[in-house]
């Protein structure tokens, strides 16, 4: 699928200006960049949460699922929170088991820890099939064991459903583990894109090299 090029301006300052982009189906495209590079704004615009300056659709005819950085559970059980995005108890049980929160199914979601809430939110978004699944820092609150389980589930979902996954992440290691393609943002602009391992192992742009060196890659 392809996005149109677009810009986003805040208080007279252009914070994001991107060209037309391809987001392949059946693949995970990771978006990396320093804080303030425009990653989350990009995600919100694609998801329709915010509007680009052009005030026209960035994607057309595409169903989009969006998982924000921070999720706020409803005042109901963990299982019922997950079922708000699809009435399929068997699927909910499968997802909760995969992320090791099955024992919390009947517990009030308001009592979950940050990591447990993140796992519940990921289960909830994966209840439905989408053409494009946008995940904004989905594992930040998780420990490493849960992160690896979540990554496995995301990869399996992508492969089984053929959806395109756009993964916003601050973790270069995470991008290396599960991403097929990589987009690198710097100060609101796309400075590099390509096959993930190729970009990480042999970046073509100086700003990409500096970013990777700063994060110790």
What feature does the model see in each segment?
Residues 108-112, 116:
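Conserved ABC ATPase signature
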Residues 133-136:
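Catalytic Walker B motif of ABC-type/P-loop ATPase nucleotide-binding domains
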Residues 175-177:
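A short, surface-exposed alpha-helical micro-motif characterized by mixed small hydrophobic
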């Amino acid at each position: 699928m392809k996005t149109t090029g677009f810009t986003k301006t805040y208080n007279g300052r252009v914070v994001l200006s991107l060209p037309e982009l391809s987001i392949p189906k059946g693949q995970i495209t990771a978006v990396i960049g320093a804080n303030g590079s425009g990653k989350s704004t990009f995600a919100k615009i694609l998801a329709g949460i915010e509007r680009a300056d052009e005030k026209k659709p960035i994607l057309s005819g595409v169903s989009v699922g969006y998982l924000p950085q921070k999720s706020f559970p409803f005042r109901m059980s963990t299982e019922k929170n997950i079922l708000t995005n699809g009435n399929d108890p068997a699927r909910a049980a499968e997802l909760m088991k995969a992320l090791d929160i099955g024992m919390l199914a009947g517990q009030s979601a308001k009592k979950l820890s940050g990591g447990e809430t993140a796992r519940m939110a990921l289960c909830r978004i994966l209840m439905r099939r989408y053409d494009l699944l946008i995940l904004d820092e989905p594992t930040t609150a998780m420990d490493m064991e849960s992160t690896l389980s979540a990554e496995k589930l995301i990869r399996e979902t992508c492969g089984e459903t053929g959806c395109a996954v756009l993964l916003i992440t601050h973790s270069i290691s995470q991008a290396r583990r599960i991403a097929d393609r990589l987009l690198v943002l710097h100060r609101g602009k796309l400075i590099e894109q390509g096959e993930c391992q190729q970009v990480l192992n042999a970046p073509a742009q100086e700003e990409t090299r500096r970013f990777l060196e700063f994060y110790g890659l």
